[in-house]
């Protein structure tokens, strides 16, 4: 959270900006800068709806030092879905993944699923504390499938896609657990660029034909990463 205010000096003096920043741990600092901070500049490029969402979220934040408590309350009780999802993603950045995982088990959030799965995947850095927290959040929702779903969220080569990992993603499309269907489908979609007219929020028994098309792609070794994914992967050391 932060507020930036411009303080104009007397004529002939250089304009200065006083920046007040409240950090997640509750500490506050006031600095004088020559220009507005990067986070403020970014906030000016938000759409009208994004600005409204941000204002709604800030309105429910208290002056307490525990911002996580405020964000949890916003996620659990706010009337606007967009505010709830932003609160969940803020908590994710603070290392709390339970709220964002809950959204993947709720069809009301279907419009946010792709961005959320992508955001979680970006947190999958081996050796980081996030890995343990993601695994713990998945464990209570996916049970025995936790390990394979965690693998789905990581990087994936063509060989893995055409091997056991790809098979697990396709199998996940038929899961009774919505979260597993959501992650399996969105990872397949993002990697291959295909959908096969599959919808993770629908009962898998109603999507037999779509699932069979995915199964056939895997059997024929035609599950391949689209060019955009390969180009991005080549930039990662």
Give the ranges of each region predicted by the language model.
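Long, helix-rich interaction regions
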Residues: 43-55, 80-82, 99-237
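Alpha-solenoid helical-repeat scaffolds
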Residues: 67-86
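Regulatory inter-domain linker segments that are low-complexity and enriched
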Residues: 21-48, 75, 95
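Glycine- and acidic-residue-biased ligand/ion/polar-headgroup-sensing regions
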Residues: 1-10
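Tight coil/turn sites that cap or link beta-strands
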Residues: 9-25
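Helix-turn-helix repeat elements of alpha-solenoid scaffolds
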Residues: 60-65, 127
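Long, low-hydrophobicity ectodomains and other hydrophilic envelope-associated domains
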Residues: 7, 26, 31, 138-139
